[in-house]
Design a protein with these regions (language model features):
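N-terminal "mature-domain start" segment
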Residues: 1-35, 76-77, 144, 150
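Secretory pathway targeting signatures of secreted, lumenal, and periplasmic proteins
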Residues: 15-68
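Signature of long, low-cysteine stretches enriched in small and polar/charged residues
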Residues: 27, 33-35, 63-113
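Solvent-exposed, acidic/flexible segments
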Residues: 14, 18, 31, 54-58, ...
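Surface-exposed amphipathic alpha-helical segments
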Residues: 16-25, 68-69, 115-150
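A mature extracytoplasmic/lumenal domain signature
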Residues: 21-23, 31, 42, 53-55, ...
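Coil-to-beta-strand transition motifs
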Residues: 44-46, 102, 113-117
Length: 150
């Protein structure tokens, strides 16, 4: 039975976002721009999931993350071809997998009407990230955001 999200769940800034993390994700520090943070370990590798409201468009952020993994940037059409539609509450967004040699980033980006976006990102060991894709997608779908840029 799925746990019901609580306004005071550890790992969340309750004024900004709430959701239901998988039971094996442990709350991490919620500071500064991080409105939610969770961590998990498997086979000696760490994964971190963060939820951050910020500016910048989808392509610029995806290419910044690709650069962190030492990958070449995508153009707009490549981004369209490699992203999937995703929904969290009443927000529509894009889901993308950025596989690096040893690390992978899973990300969901939800633009808001006021010009900003919510960025939900998992980063960690590629093998473990692959195993966490379904849990990450379920977490993303469970999220409910407070308006941050209106």
């Amino acid at each position: 039975r799925a746990r019901r999200p609580s306004r005071s769940s550890p790992g969340f800034d309750p004024t900004a976002v709430r959701g239901t993390p998988p039971p094996d994700w442990k709350p991490g520090p919620v500071t500064g721009m991080r409105k939610a943070c969770f961590r998990m370990q498997a086979d000696g590798h760490n994964l971190e999931v963060t939820v951050i409201p910020a500016g910048g468009d989808l392509l610029a952020n995806v290419n910044r993350w690709r650069g962190q993994l030492k990958l070449e940037p995508l153009d707009q059409q490549q981004l369209i071809d490699s992203s999937l539609d995703v929904k969290a509450g009443n927000l529509d967004g894009k889901y993308i997998v950025i596989p690096g040699a040893s690390e992978t980033i899973l990300a969901a980006i939800f633009p808001e009407a006021g010009g900003g976006s919510w960025f939900v990102k998992l980063r960690g060991d590629s093998k473990i990230a692959e195993l966490q894709q379904e849990a990450f997608r379920a977490f993303v779908s469970s999220l409910r955001f407070s308006p941050s840029f209106q």
